[in-house]
Amino acid sequence: MLSLAHALESQLRAAIDRAFPEAAASARESGTGLDPQLAPASKPEFGDFQANAALPLAKPLKQPPRQIAAAIVDQLMVDTAFNAICLTPDIAGPGFINLTVRPECLAAEVQARLADARLGVPLVEGDNDGQQPTPVVVDFSSPNIAKEMHVGHLRSTIIGDSLARVLEFRGHPVLRLNHVGDWGTQFGMLITHLKQVAPEALETADAVDLGDLVVFYRQAKQRFDDDEAFQTTSREEVVKLQGGDPLSLKAWSLLCDQSRREFQKIYDRLDVRLNERGESFYNAYLESVVEDLNVSGLLVSDDGAQCVFLEGVTGKDGKPLPVIVQKSDGGFNYATTDLAAMRYRFAAPPQGDGARRVIYVTDAGQANHFAGVFQVAQRAGWIPDAGRLQHVPFGLVQGEDGKKLKTRAGDTVRLRELLDEAVERAESDLRRRLQEEGRDEDESFIEQVATTVGLAAVKYADLSQNRITNYQFSFDRMLALQGNTAPYLLYAVVRIAGIARKGGDLDVTTAELQFSETQEWALVRELLKFDAVIAEVEEELLPNRLCTYLFELSQVFNRFYDQVPVLKAEQPSRSCRLALCRLTADTLKLGLSLLGIPTLERM
């Protein structure tokens, strides 16, 4: 109900101005204006919206809040536009103004959404000069080359993908960046190991199959730890790689390509799109980052290292903490690369991406790192006045014992194996249910449903949690058909598809929607919250808000369908209720798609 909320806010401001012209004029002079403090009603019995402006006005106006509220209501009642939207306002408690939207307005909103593929969600507007919206960068996933993706990459990948989907749906040009770890000293040992175990690949191959990358990495690391000569050669390889030695670059490229192929298999399964732009992309910009910081007067030499001391951030000794951008040996580090990336992403094309909002989706353990480099980038003047740098932190994935999720052997859980198990468990549950129901389905149906449900369960279990907190991973909970789970939401969509199979025309049109039952109005009001929820997710970057909404919508729909006849109802109620079924299905499908979850017609 965003459009109604905007109209009501405007009408409330005008009513307050008319009721208290002197206070309104004074507020305008101060550059603020009097805020009607309009918000969705906290409980259904309070109507649809609640305006709380009377309470903060009591002290400056030296009047009781209820008296102020009454004066505002008097002005609202002479506004024909307001009266066309709302019933007579109710003053509650110390001075809250409760607003209830007229039933015919709610019905008209439902009618409009039935004809709108965007379900009332507006596209973001461009700049005032008519330009298109500026790009938003979402930096997520970001695995390391020569290491297999593990459960720790799950959260960044699917949270980042969901946020990118919401931003894209709102109309923002989104640059989905995969800042893979494709550079660094570890490549010295990896290249040395590759040259020794597969030297022929460096002469002839455009691709190399190193088998299990995790095993390959461990072998290289073991040799590096145990063999002094291997260590020496590895360090020499780092120098060669940084110097552009063709053979070292070929080995590096082969390692990157194999990792890239393995990563893509995961991304394809999860239906995640990414543009790879690894750490190595910024190598050419690192020296100029240090030069810029020096010119701006931020750079300080400390024990041979070049660093920027942070403002307002001190260590245990009370001294400002540094962000090191060049080590004493002349080398660069993660902070240098991240600063180069920030500068590039905000720089105007063709020198950069021209973004005005850059979002980093990483684990909460990197919060201090990003706070530091964000401050440095701001002080260096690389962030435009309207630019927004945002870190989207998330907690750990834990086992049901509350500890970091591990295999029985104590190893990190590989993401590929976790997804495999989710699908296998979903298939087992499905086969058991089919047997109990006496249903005979072909193998292609079983494979499709198991794959969809298994992957959806993993995604939704993660996204439905507040990302800031740790969450406990449980296959049993996430695959349950009851509760706030993907199977529960998918089943609501399937249930509506079943109505159509039983002869209910979900595309039926009716000249005027009419509702009379409490359950109908509850569903109407829940459906009309969708646009506000999307706007909230876009701003606060919390996908769990969308999950909570979709779960509550499914609950309201199930109560409606269980308590009110649909197919057996008389006209015009039958058509009106079928319209609500269709809008519910459309809303669930669109909402789930923004979470990266496809739906099913049958389960």
From Swiss-Prot:
It holds the Pfam family Arg_tRNA_synt_N. One of its GO terms (cellular component) is cytoplasm. Monomer. GO terms for biological process: arginyl-tRNA aminoacylation. This is Arginine--tRNA ligase. The keyword Iron-sulfur does not apply. Its EC number is 6.1.1.19. One of its GO terms (molecular function) is ATP binding. The gene is argS. It comes from the Bacteria. It comes from Prochlorococcus marinus (strain MIT 9303). A motif ('HIGH' region) lies at residues 143-153. InterPro entries: aa-tRNA-synth_I_CS, Arg-tRNA-ligase, Arg-tRNA-synth_N, Arg-tRNA-synth_N_sf, ArgRS_core, DALR_anticod-bd, Rossmann-like_a/b/a_fold, tRNAsynth_Ia_anticodon-bd. It is found in: Cytoplasm. The keyword Protein biosynthesis applies. Belongs to the class-I aminoacyl-tRNA synthetase family. It catalyses: tRNA(Arg) + L-arginine + ATP = L-arginyl-tRNA(Arg) + AMP + diphosphate. Gene3D superfamilies: Arginyl tRNA synthetase N-terminal domain (3.30.1360.70), HUPs (3.40.50.620), Isoleucyl-tRNA Synthetase, Domain 1 (1.10.730.10). CDD domains: Anticodon_Ia_Arg, ArgRS_core.
